[in-house]
Amino acid sequence: MMENLTLYEAESNLRDIVNNYNDLNRIKNEAETRFHLIDEIIEKCFGWDKSQITVERYMQNNGFTDYELGKPTSIIIEAKKEGITFELPPAMLKDKNIIDIPSLMKMNVELKEAIMQVQEYGAKRGAACVVATNGHQFIIFLPTNTNGTPPLNGNALVFSSLSNMLENFKMAWEAISYVGIKERRVFNKLGSNINSIPNKFS
């Protein structure tokens, strides 16, 4: 278990990854490179041990990879196969990394489909939060709410690039790291009732 991974160490690991994967076209166009990158980020930057990671890859037919983190499942990640870039709207809120989901879904079909699909998976699996990514951009949001707001009308934590994630790493760490999920910080950031979190995992 990588529970002892510190914020400083995790940020340093992401900096190394950004330096090593500076060829964006390679990340976008080579599926195995992209999946290896996501694997590294999950383990080295967010402290998830291999024993807490379940991966199902549907590369031929559906064009995405599902990661389930935690036992029971706390995070579901949909990693798109296609070498696409998510078009992102300008941030309208004070926090530049928080964007409302309806605006995200208006920007392009691929992102809308990814958001809708991972939200459905997350709700069915009882995940605390879900992530849609193409390997270099990350959209993080809550698949369910108990405050009366439909989940797809809420807000998402958005990192427009790996460099943007590095610049705002504390925010990413609190949202989807192993220790961040244990402390339920994503709910504070995205404004959901804390009772919607799944049972504590080992």
Question: Where are each of the predicted segments found?
Answer:
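A short, conserved, highly charged catalytic patch centered on acidic carboxylates
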Residues: M1-C129, Q137-S202
